[in-house]
A protein has these predicted regions:
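N-terminal structured helix/loop subdomain that forms the ligand-binding/catalytic interface
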Residues: 1-145, 176
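Short acidic (Asp/Glu) and glycine-rich catalytic loops that position anionic groups and cofactors
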Residues: 42-47, 216-224, 247-249
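Active-site beta-strand/loop microenvironment that shapes enzyme catalytic pockets
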Residues: 142-173
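Long, low-complexity, charged/polar intrinsically disordered regions in eukaryotic proteins
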Residues: 162-230
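Short amphipathic alpha-helical interface segments
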Residues: 229-257
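Short, cationic-aromatic polyanion-contact patches
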Residues: 234, 283-292
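Short amphipathic alpha-helical interaction segments
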Residues: 260-273
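A short, conserved structural fragment
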Residues: 273-283
Length: 292
């Protein structure tokens, strides 16, 4: 993708980064890990209040990464590209497959404001009361939610991780779930319990925060580039189509046919690539997907 001219202001200039000193803290004790994780969460909180961050897209991209991580927990071979295909190319009535189900759950968990209804839509098998608020500090609540879910279903890492991130977001007062524990915790990590799991969750938040902050900065720059080319787009409904691109991890041209013809949708997507405002994400000649 083409970069903005060096004379242009950097849209991500005032977005926070994870400082090197914070990355380097040992986090060997719960107190040290809590300090580091708290600082990282404060930076993530700042990102969510900055207008230049395409938040829906940011959450969607993180959700895709979390889905790939969760698929690894289950021993599945699918990575981000395969899960993206399952989500974007699925037709009404199609079964997304096991990895696609994981991707769909994470996508549904992040795309709407956090609520009991959002969690039930993401995890239809949730029992009444699962996901309820718990006592303690935010990461303590998240750790307890994970431990409780695994006590009910030890192999269901997806439910445990979604509920853990939901508990964390609620405790922090965030409007939407952000898949930090889904990104930062490994299958081995989930074998711990009690204080050990709490320590691991603090470390996982710090581990996930750095890449999440960098992704926010990258997407802010790419979103600014996309917005800058809108006057060059000739298709009717271009502004609405651009808003859809800014809200999704990826789109197929067919997703735009409610706004324009199939041919116009393909031209629109190819024009974005030509202008350096989007990428074709698959490398294929057919069934192409586009995004930032």
């Amino acid at each position: 993708m083409s970069r903005a001219r060096s004379s242009d202001p950097d849209p991500a200039a005032d977005l926070p980064r994870l400082p090197d000193w914070l990355r380097g803290l040992p986090g060997e004790t719960l107190e040290d890990a809590a300090l580091s994780a708290g600082a990282a969460l404060a930076l993530l909180h700042q990102v969510q209040s900055r207008a230049q961050t395409p938040l829906a897209l940011w959450r969607a991209r993180l959700a895709l990464q979390a889905a790939a991580q969760t698929a690894r927990h289950a021993g599945r071979p699918e990575r981000e590209a395969a899960i993206r295909d399952a989500l974007c190319l699925m037709r009404p009535g199609d079964a997304p497959g096991p990895a696609g189900e994981i991707g769909l759950a994470w996508q549904r968990a992040v795309e709407r404001p956090l609520s009991d209804e959002t969690l039930a839509r993401a995890l239809p098998h949730l029992a009444a009361g699962q996901g309820a608020a718990l006592p303690g500090a935010p990461i303590q609540q998240a750790s307890a939610a994970i431990e409780a879910a695994l006590a009910e279903a030890p192999r269901d890492h997806l439910t445990a991780l979604v509920l853990g991130d939901a508990a964390l977001a609620r405790a922090l007062g965030w409007s939407h779930l952000l898949p930090l524990l889904g990104l930062g915790l490994t299958r081995r990590d989930l074998g711990a319990g009690g204080v050990d799991l709490r320590l691991t969750c603090h470390r996982a938040v710090l581990k996930a925060a750095g890449p999440a902050l960098q992704l926010a900065a990258d997407l802010a720059r790419q979103a600014a580039r996309l917005q800058s080319v809108v006057p060059k787009l000739r298709a009717k409904q271009s502004t609405r189509a651009v808003q859809l691109v800014l809200a999704r991890d990826a789109i197929a041209p067919a997703m735009l046919t409610g706004l324009m013809s199939d041919r116009a949708a393909r031209r629109f997507c190819d024009r974005l690539v030509e202008l350096g405002a989007a990428r074709e994400l698959t490398g294929r000649e057919t069934f192409r997907l586009y995004g930032l």
